[in-house]
């Protein structure tokens, strides 16, 4: 087998025609969203009930979209693999949601949020999309307050805000450390109302396994009932994927165990381009791994960096308890290196800094894989009660997991995989390269570039679901009325079902000696080592040599007990690992081809003398949109050139 080490620069992929966002309007960036909404064709309210829209996922993006589309009059068929829509992983989001309300009159504005997001993403996001997100952020808070979301309030009753990384204003609205939960319950109650009204047909415990494409357009999905194992087809005039990101390819992440990439990857195999798969986010404040037994990591909200101070001992190998290390022997390294932003630098920078001090031998805790997040100064300044009111549930969660009281001893934290900025390529209308297939929330790549700012995931999910998609999908439905009825007997549907059943039967037939989880752990550890916080040409080539070998071994040795006609979690897991084994290869290939450092993608060969990420704008100012050809075959790279009219690329500085 030819190894990647022997390939020439372009032998492992081909470069196709450039891709353009043809729907992006021109004119001043502040007017483009209004321009696009005016240009879009509409569907008469009386005709909307004649249209069916499939929505896959019930998190913030999917729940908001399903509720809003049904409220508009469309018939919505919605799917989630959980036993209830409110079990979506959005419920785990902690710290807050950004919005340019400027309640504190501290200099915030829509333009500043736009600027901070483009800069925070290291100039690898579209200006048009980011400005739209900043505009809509203001409306999101009004929507959520109207739903009764219990945002924190100041003494006088006004909504309270706090700061997150990469900004110098206070724009993050929050509900203690449970913001995702409260926002999701708001979307869930709106969705439940439409379910009760008969406008949304909900299918829980049902997983999408393939996309049905008819005459080049998305017309339905193949799904499996996870309780009975029954394979069914569902048809619609448009399909919306709101299935989240692909962080669980790393095995250990802060994502829920069942979060997976199957929906977006199967859509990719059917023609939807996958953009910037190497742009993955590593969160700097997570509880460190405690041993090989773990299958999940736990996030500690970025909001803690408002009042907690991050430090390590100045001396290498200092194993004294934190309380015994004097102040003058502590290195508050973020405050030292980045005095303007201190502990609130963007996530990619904070994560690399933590890795660097641990690599120097100054880490704390077991194996030296941790740094301190210390609240002693905050407690002395504000009092324990005030700290408890702001962070009490997070402190309680930390103590339950670690048996350490963070009011008395510093938290120990270390970076972990948390979010994926890459995803399905979408145009300004959030439509993929498969007409009629839309991707929203973390399932797409559109708004965050190479690094997402904290508290912007909830903002994007609700912006896409409540405001953007319900406006843009009308245009598609109005311009593409489907005259042909599609049912289970259509050749495209029959073929999609056959391929799905064959894949499941093949998994069951191998009868090997290794569990799906063992393969998931192996591929995850490989990707973390070579495509994690720091990446090198040599390491990525090693990964690309090894992944096909793991994939080949998987199909020889996988063991899936039981049958496909029953509740079978081993089969569920194996089916998802199949996708991870393909997606991991594309992630590493994308990271290898992008021979620059930007945001969360850090190539050790491309850094400044100070160790910061060094972009190569003359070569890589584009979104990399990958076209699937076949498993193990060379994909096709399509480049979408990025232009910057309002926020000109510079070397990011947070010093």
PLM region spans:
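Extreme N-terminal leader/targeting segments of oxidoreductases
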Residues: 1-53
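Conserved N-terminal glycine-rich FAD pyrophosphate-binding loop of Rossmann-like flavoproteins
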Residues: 83-115, 281-285, 292-296
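Glycine- and aromatic-enriched mobile tails/lids
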Residues: 40-52, 65-68, 72-74, 78, ...
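Glycine-rich loop(s) and the adjacent beta-strand/alpha-helix scaffold that form part
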Residues: 238-293, 297, 448-471
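An anion/pyrophosphate-binding glycine-rich loop and adjacent beta-alpha core
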Residues: 266, 273-400, 471-474
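Short hydrophobic core segments
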Residues: 54-56, 234-243
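Conserved redox-cofactor binding core of oxidoreductases
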Residues: 140, 145-230, 235, 286-297
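N-terminal Rossmann-fold NAD(P) dinucleotide-binding loop
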Residues: 62
